[in-house]
């Protein structure tokens, strides 16, 4: 047997071995067919406990999203496996169990983490955050190296004129493109708030468009329109499914467990200066460079707009109405986020970053400067 035949045989053997080990053997393992997982549930007494349950299958929309995830190569950079080694549990959440992958064929463990692990990302961020992230990751993570996935959107349809309708509403000019997105005869309206650059995201087609800018978020006369698609919606649904088979594990996640009542931070110019850097890197994409709640990503956040810090109004606080929150209130919000809104948890930031950004928000953005003698 000559060397050429040996090489050919070896190549065929190892290719077959790889298919068997990575494709066939996992299906033969009993663990690959078990649905049992442990998840955190809240009992009738309000207690959080780990209990044994069965994993649930993907919905039709989630399966569409999973195919998009595979097609677009998301698994090249993102793993879906929390390893049983030091630091993984604290960084990502509970260690992976076999039952979580019972409906995954093929599995998407991946082997590299160029981007973060996604096995516990479900419900960490809002749907709107993910939409902004897919359109342009730098909107919400300025130092991200993730590519844009603008092709998943319908659009952009550029230079659409803002006009006034018969009822005095600011709406969008009817063109061939906008006619495919909106129903100009519909009685059901969709409120659209462009960002400062004039980008408008349409979350639901078939409604009558109304430009809604209560705080003069946008004063231009043309906008660029992008809209939701079935593949984009499915991809977001799939991402939000990841990790949810483990129940309310976030409520027991140690890094988010805090005693905010003990937090008190003296005012410091040094902290404020550093806080501005943190704000620019982590918060500006949603809340805007001046804290008015209209950052580049804000147009995607159609259900819960980012907080306008300049108004000095904070919903989650222990202080009386009309007053600023305590440092502990802001610490809790920054650390744990606000479930159901576009505000994610920032527990992974160093303490000094969270302290500094609270100082910057409190003493630079959320202050009434109408009296120069008492600017704070």
Named regions from a protein language model:
Residues 65, 71-80, 130, 235, ...:
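The canonical Cys-X-X-Cys-His
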Residues 39-70, 84-85, 114-116, 224, ...:
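Electrostatic cytochrome c docking/interface patches
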Residues 83-84, 292-293:
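Short, non-ligating residues that shape and space the ligands of small metal-coordination modules
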Residues 8-23:
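Hydrophobic membrane-insertion alpha-helices, especially the h-region
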Residues 28-44:
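Alpha-helical transmembrane signal-anchor/signal-peptide segments
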Residues 294-298:
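Conserved catalytic-core motifs of eukaryotic protein kinase domains, centered on the activation segment
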Residues 55, 62, 87-236, 299-349, ...:
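Extracytoplasmic electron-transfer domains, predominantly the class I c-type cytochrome c fold
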Residues 1-8:
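N-terminal positive-inside, membrane-proximal cytosolic segments immediately preceding the first
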